[in-house]
Amino acid sequence: MKKWNQIIIDRSNKITKVNKPKNFKDFSEEMGGYDVNEYFKSKKSFFEFYFHGRYVIWSNYLKSSINPFTKTLSIASGNGINELDLISNNFNIICSDLEIPQCYEELKKLFGHFDYLKLNILKDIISIEFDNIYSISVCYIFSDQNLEKFFINVHKMLKKNGILILDSGGGEDNLTSFFFIDIYLVIEAYLIYYLSKIFNKKIGFKFDNNFGYKRKNREIKKFAKKFGFEFIDIKEYDYLTELQRSILIRKIIEYFPFSKKVFVSLGKMIPYIRMFKFKKI
């Protein structure tokens, strides 16, 4: 495991360092907010705005991995993009998060009643036993100590032979990600910042020292095994998201679309989506 620091280019015209721990509001803002907006007018407008890109990848994987007639708990559901797609396809999904989002009541008007629980997976345990539990793009924020708590509590809430699906929430900790994220992106950010001063542009960046953690595949498997899970398989998807953290790469793809295939090939070394499937033993 290694600390994952993120750089975000913005229009602040300064370099900002962020060290504070994140709360539910921070995560909500990172995901675009959970408030009701103009896209809550209908199911169609909701899905057209929110359900695309990696959300489609996640939903397709979940549909192929979960029996719709079994009971499934979603950890950190947010505004329920994947969950509502599954519910619309007759899956039995119970949502949960640190707080129930403000948009919950409005979503029930669109999609009908569905359960949403206030749940801190690091502290709380539900008395209900589930056939499946899944967690999408969450475990990257957990320290080793918190990841242990996560596996312990999930194990208690799963039936015997129950399935845990875990998305890592970012590329693997390897040499490629180290050179790209910890070296190249930092150099690129400083170059853009100082060049913006020469050309009198208001460009700055935020250096988030508390973004999360990166882990090797074998580290996640080791944690799961330690706390009573058998590894079934891993599927990897989305080979561009990590690389597109670079402004230069985004511009190259924009102006030279044929280059996308090259970057997809390179991105296979740091896939953004890593779907782990485990069974409780």
Please name every model-derived segment.
Residues 79-122:
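Class I SAM-dependent methyltransferase SAM/SAH-binding core
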Residues 148-160:
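A short glycine-rich, Lys/Arg-flanked "PGG" loop and its adjoining helix->strand segment in the class I
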